[in-house]
Amino acid sequence: MKRLIIKLFLSLCLWAVLPVCAQDAVHYYFRTMDIRNGLSQNTVYQILQDRKGFMWFGTKDGLNRYDGLSFRIYKKENSGLGKNFITALYEDRRGNIWIGTDGGVFIYDPVLDSFTAFDEASDNGSIIRDFVTMIGSDEDDNIWISVENQGLFCYKPDEGRLLNHLHDSGLPNVTRFWLNGNTCWLALYADNLYYTKADFETPLQPFKDAEGNEIFKNDIINWQVSGPHNCVYIASLNGLTEINQTTGKTRKLLNTYVRALQFKSDNELWVGAESGLYIYNLTNDKITHLTVPDQDDSYALSDNAIYSLYKDAEGGIWIGSYFGGIDYYPTQYATFEKYYPIIGQNSLSGKVVREFCEDEDGNLWIGTEDGGLNKFNPKTKEFSPCPLAGLHYNVHALSMDNHTLWIGTYSKGLYSLDLKTRRSRHYLMGHAENTLNDNNIYSMCRTSAGQLYIGTTTGLNLYNHETNDFTRIHKMDGIFVFNILEDSKGNIWFATYNSGIFKYNPRNNSWKNYVST
């Protein structure tokens, strides 16, 4: 059995390598966290990982800090955070976290574990009080904040000075901004994409493509990321657009409402939309579209409306949605294929996998404690229902004896299934000496000599092929035999519950018991 498990592990590793070369074979498995796991609310607008590794999630009802095990929730009711609707998150060079809300900005000090309202007055007397759409910084570590109805602010921490731009311009609200050297790019709500000098001493200029078209006119821009080859990617109401800043040429990559963007690698752009998650391969322009499946799938996306994306320090992707909370795609999920129960599909029948066994044709028989026995074809990667009636739950042991599969169950005794004839037999505990000593089968081992040992919760049995019955090994009476293994010298080892380890040497019929001292 142990050799089989090692073989299976290597086989799974091989399967894991193949999707790297063949994009068609990639499967995406997500781990969902929502209010059932302690999240304060399921609408996740903002995601941030701080320098200590904590994950922060801004929701419509509270700020959440996740340590990998549990959530800590900050609200105005239990902290100095003055608002519960979190709209923006940013960590500055000092490690403080700036929190934008629907009514101002607050700063979290991780040393003091406290919040302070950012009440700095600007050069024109303005204090940030409205809906914050974004917080970022420039190369000089100045903090930039865009606010509905109040324009764009620039806070210079070294000077303690707050500047307010566009406050009296009559322009629509700034939804997104980014700074590239001395140039500030601004997306105005349902208006256009503009650029100007970062000191705002020059008028705003609308962006035009190489043909002179204002392609973002009347659009709503939600997100922007910089990519390879001096390209910028814009997420908007009208879709996903690539801008080559060297040539001025643009490409429309998607024609759906896009809210969030995140590069997973230089050539793989994750796109959060109202219609699900798109994974765009910039090398070959191939798109993988993931949505909530019709059938129940515990590892699928939890919601199609994606509002935020974030890549953590380990390369995992965090996905915030409108109704479904958080979906996490860790890097290790890409290493292995995952098989689990999916209602309405020919899938693995249970979640609690107990045993593996390979037959002569290379099929894998998988015993589960909550769903019975499964047959898996590694070539087609398909599951077949067990041909033996009654084995729909609690399989605890499997062993192959030529073309006969032996199946040990909890409380239902022992089954044998001839895989060629499909004939089966059922063995139960009896009063006679040549019957099983218990119906709770926990372990089995077929030795190199062809002997089949069956461990139960109350002892050990040896199957007699010629007489089709059993010999009870009284040396192990009353002992819970948890596992059985044959070593390279033909010795049989028995792992027990609370009785140590037994070694049996069949050559001289000797036993030795090893216990802790």
Each predicted region: which residue ranges?
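Carboxylate-rich, polar loop motifs that coordinate divalent cations or form catalytic acidic clusters
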Residues: M1-T517
